[in-house]
A protein has these predicted regions:
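Conserved alpha-helical scaffold segments that buttress catalytic/binding sites
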Residues: 2-46, 53-163
Length: 163
């Protein structure tokens, strides 16, 4: 898998990534096209998915990855030694289904290497490609989704409130 075909590097603004003692942002490494470190030496991978086209009444959730990073990287680091690589944002496809395929492939790629992936942004509709990425490798899935609302609606259409 050629990551650079799937990803847009995240370039943190200096005020976002705090190098203040103990802040998480000071310990995160950032992937870009010039990245030369051993990719799989990292334990945790972060990817943003700026996709909101099927998010009912919340199309702007596609802007969430970078907003979440602002708060996440300002948190204090815990007493653990896991290494973290921020892969940037997944390139969204011409069609939402293209984004789903790319996300599923990225998840499968990392799951095969037994890596932990934290997905930022997007709507609940992203649960399906994340699940399929795990299922295609035969893994059980531990999943947590943080949201302001519980979204349960009946219907056959696949969107963010049909879960």
């Amino acid at each position: 898998m050629e990551l650079k075909e799937y990803l847009e590097a995240y370039r943190p603004a200096s005020e976002i990534v705090s190098h203040e003692s103990g802040r998480l942002g000071g310990f995160v490494h950032f992937y870009n096209e010039d990245f030369r470190a051993e990719l799989f030496s990292y334990d945790v991978f972060i990817v943003g998915v700026p996709e909101g086209r099927r998010s009912v009444n919340n199309e702007t959730c596609g802007l969430a990855p970078d907003k979440i990073r602002e708060s996440l990287y300002d948190l204090y680091r815990g007493d653990w030694s896991s290494s973290i690589l921020d892969l940037g944002n997944l390139r969204i496809g011409n069609d939402v289904d293209d984004t789903y395929v790319a996300l599923k492939e990225l998840v499968t790629f990392l799951v095969q290497k037994k890596k932990c992936l934290l997905v930022l942004g997007g709507g609940h509709d992203l649960i399906t490609p994340i699940y399929r990425g795990h299922a295609s490798y035969g893994n059980l899935l531990n999943f947590a989704s943080l949201d302001a609302y519980l979204d349960f609606q009946d219907g056959d259409e696949h969107h963010s409130k049909s879960f």
